[in-house]
């Protein structure tokens, strides 16, 4: 078999393939044997009919069509393996010559990974916001803790923000009662913004057994999106009494003996949370800095697949009702055109990010170890509240393990970029990134690390992008 590659663009090639007819003869023999078992010819036992008679019965052209169709995937795969191209997605195959006894010729056009040269990581500079912790941050955490230990007490006064009320709701559209929108005895914290838009404003100032009518759009049911007249009736009003922030409260709410110790602990928690936020900012800023220095050509089919995935996710909550989706966008002050433009821009950036990080991982010869995969499984399973083994089975059943493998490999490439870069805050202070991104692994340590699967990184990454 012979094959040549034509570069149509930085992201697309045409592979020209020529297969000698002699290489197809074994395929013909196998096909004849299978047909002989299925086709009954008078005077011959099943499986014993001569090839010539089978060919006459089925037709040579039909046989040839079947053989060629069966042979194309493997011959295309062989041509790809013999080249240095890395396909993305499915090829567009066209048979250009197909005659019995002569060489088979076909072309395959396919998007490929563009050749990308990552920049010098040691020259990379990243700047992010500094971590600032004020008394207001600690006060907010303390207030949240006091709220958790607060008690609700019935009061005989009008509703105020922060109260917890018991309410009844009913709604009408054009004078018609909407049974699905009615509820009794709902508990609602005023000011939380939950339940229905406009509800908080409606109940403030009402006393027990008083009602008010306000206008709101229904969010669900057959009248979803329509304006409704909503009646809210307050049945009871309770205020939340908070414990005093003193030593006694510290002993009640924590393992500390004094409020000062509790505040110090809350300050540490705030700092840790802000360090995690800063780490995410470093991660994103590093990717942006890399993208600014590298031209990443975009494979159109890959971008379209990413865009389709975004749209699919957006429509899934509406049973893929695009008309309703378009209506909701208008209600939110947007439009389908604006959504599509924003989604395509995001898809293009995501594709650039993936391709660049894959190229960086190739250049750095990143290997995904068993520990790396285990760490990702444990972290992800905690987010979903399931056991790691259960998550592994779920991913394996849906053939999503290659996607996770590719994501982990890209994350390791990001860590390497962050470690090599100069990272400072906007005040000029150097930031120690080792807590969240780890320390650079030496060449000797990298060689000793056990890879998750020899050669699996590229295969997994390719499968994840098809």
From Swiss-Prot:
Residues 162-215 form the PPIase FKBP-type domain. InterPro entries: PPIase_dom_sf, PPIase_FKBP_dom, Trig_fac, Trigger_fac_C, Trigger_fac_C_sf, Trigger_fac_ribosome-bd_bac, Trigger_fac_ribosome-bd_sf, Trigger_fact/SurA_dom_sf. It is an enzyme of class 5 (isomerase). Its EC number is 5.2.1.8. Gene3D superfamilies: 3.10.50.40, Trigger factor ribosome-binding domain, Trigger factor, C-terminal domain. Keywords: Cell cycle, Cell division, Chaperone, Cytoplasm, Isomerase, Rotamase, Stress response. It is found in: Cytoplasm. It comes from the Bacteria. GO terms for biological process: 'de novo' cotranslational protein folding; cell division; cellular response to starvation; chaperone-mediated protein folding; protein transport; protein unfolding; response to antibiotic. Expression in M.smegmatis enhances its survival within macrophages, adaptation to oxidative stress and biofilm formation. Belongs to the FKBP-type PPIase family. Tig subfamily. Involved in protein export. Acts as a chaperone by maintaining the newly synthesized protein in an open conformation. Functions as a peptidyl-prolyl cis-trans isomerase. Protects the cells against high-temperatures and aids in the restoration of enzyme activity of thermally denaturated proteins. Contributes to tolerance and adaptation to host-generated stresses. Has strong immunomodulatory potential and modifies the cytokine profile of the host towards the proinflammatory axis. PANTHER family: TRIGGER FACTOR CHAPERONE AND PEPTIDYL-PROLYL CIS/TRANS ISOMERASE, TRIGGER FACTOR-LIKE PROTEIN TIG, CHLOROPLASTIC. Consists of 3 domains; the N-terminus binds the ribosome, the middle domain has PPIase activity, while the C-terminus has intrinsic chaperone activity on its own. This is Trigger factor. It comes from Mycobacterium tuberculosis (strain ATCC 25618 / H37Rv).
């Amino acid at each position: 078999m012979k094959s040549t590659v034509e570069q149509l663009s930085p992201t697309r090639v045409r592979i020209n393939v020529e297969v000698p007819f002699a290489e197809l003869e074994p395929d013909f023999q196998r096909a004849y044997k299978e047909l002989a078992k299925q086709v009954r010819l008078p005077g011959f036992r099943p499986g014993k009919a001569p090839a010539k008679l089978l060919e006459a019965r089925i037709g040579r052209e039909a046989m040839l069509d079947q053989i060629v169709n069966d042979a194309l995937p493997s011959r295309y795969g062989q041509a790809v393996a013999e080249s240095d191209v890395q396909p993305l997605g499915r090829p567009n195959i066209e048979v250009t010559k197909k005659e019995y006894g002569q060489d088979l010729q076909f072309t395959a056009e396919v998007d490929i990974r563009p050749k990308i040269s990552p920049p010098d990581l040691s020259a990379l500079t990243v700047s992010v916001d500094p971590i600032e912790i004020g008394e207001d941050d600690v006060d907010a955490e303390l207030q949240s803790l006091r709220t958790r230990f607060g008690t609700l007490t019935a009061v005989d006064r009008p509703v105020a923000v922060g109260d917890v009320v018991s309410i009844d709701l009913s709604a009408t559209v054009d004078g018609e009662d909407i049974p699905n929108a009615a509820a009794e005895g709902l508990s609602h914290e005023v000011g939380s913004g939950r339940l229905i838009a406009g509800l908080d404003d409606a109940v403030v100032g009402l006393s027990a057994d008083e009602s008010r009518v306000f206008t709101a759009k229904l969010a669900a049911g057959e009248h979803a999106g329509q304006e409704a007249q909503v009646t809210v009736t307050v049945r009871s009003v309770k205020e939340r009494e908070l414990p005093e922030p003193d030593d006694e409260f510290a002993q009640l709410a924590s393992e500390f003996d004094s409020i000062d110790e509790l505040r110090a602990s809350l300050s540490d928690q705030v700092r840790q949370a802000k360090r995690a936020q800063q780490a995410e900012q470093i991660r994103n800023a590093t990717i942006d800095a890399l993208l600014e220095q590298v031209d990443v050509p975009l494979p159109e089919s890959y971008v379209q697949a990413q865009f389709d995935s975004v749209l699919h996710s957006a429509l899934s909550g509406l049973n893929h009702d695009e008309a309703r989706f378009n209506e909701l966008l208008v209600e939110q002050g947007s439009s389908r055109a604006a959504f599509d433009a924003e989604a395509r821009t995001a898809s293009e950036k995501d594709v650039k990010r993936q391709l660049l990080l894959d190229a960086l991982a190739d250049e750095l010869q990143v290997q995904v170890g068993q520990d790396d995969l285990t760490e990702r499984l444990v972290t992800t399973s905690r987010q979903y509240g399931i056991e790691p083994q259960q998550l592994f089975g779920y991913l394996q059943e849906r053939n999503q393990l290659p996607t996770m493998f590719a994501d982990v490999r890209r994350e390791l490439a990001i860590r390497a970029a962050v470690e090599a870069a100069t990272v400072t805050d906007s005040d000029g202070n150097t930031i120690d990134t080792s807590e969240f991104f780890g320390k650079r692994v030496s060449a000797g340590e990298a060689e000793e690390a056990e890879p998750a699967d020899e050669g699996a990184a590229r295969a997994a990454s390719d499968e994840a992008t098809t």
